[in-house]
């Protein structure tokens, strides 16, 4: 709501805190990607399990490196209470397709802690998008005929055509 009123990403998140689910106080993770490819990420969490204090961390990527992405996890490992993620977002090499990206991310999340994952690819030239949703308890998917393989972007289709032509 705040961003739709012209406020910044950080200003919008200054109106929020972590989840009030004592003793874990689940962190809230947010990100925004801009049309120029730059992006910002945030984690809002309690001060080492102190529900009276919020800590807000913002990460700005104004000139992202092609093929690289960043990841923030809610928690760093199991515990009682569960300890929140610490440090800077983890850097990783981005797979070529949204399907590879989403499947790889889902497969590498801790099975005891993962609940849901949403991934979206947007063609910046046409604005067309495709979504993938994973849910630990129910198979959920939208915008896709086949939940295992999302629609390909035009450049991905061209690459497949070239590979098919080379094989013939």
Per-range role (PLM):
Residues 1-168:
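Conserved short alpha-helical segments that host acidic/polar catalytic motifs at enzyme active sites
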């Amino acid at each position: 709501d705040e961003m739709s009123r012209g406020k910044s990403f950080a200003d919008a998140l200054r109106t929020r805190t972590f989840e009030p689910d004592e003793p874990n106080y689940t962190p809230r993770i947010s990100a925004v990607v801009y049309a120029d490819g730059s992006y910002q990420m945030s984690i809002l969490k309690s001060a080492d399990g102190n529900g009276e204090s919020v800590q807000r961390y913002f990460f700005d990527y104004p000139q992202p490196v092609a093929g690289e992405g960043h990841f923030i996890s809610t928690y760093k490992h199991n515990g009682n209470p569960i300890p929140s993620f610490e440090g800077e977002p983890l850097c990783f090499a981005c797979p070529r397709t949204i399907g590879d990206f989403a499947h790889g991310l889902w497969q590498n999340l801790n099975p005891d802690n993962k609940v849901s994952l949403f991934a979206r690819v947007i063609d910046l030239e046409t604005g067309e998008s495709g979504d993938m949703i994973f849910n630990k308890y129910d198979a959920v998917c939208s915008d896709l005929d086949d939940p295992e393989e999302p629609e390909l972007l035009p450049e991905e289709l061209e690459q497949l055509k070239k590979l098919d032509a080379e094989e013939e």
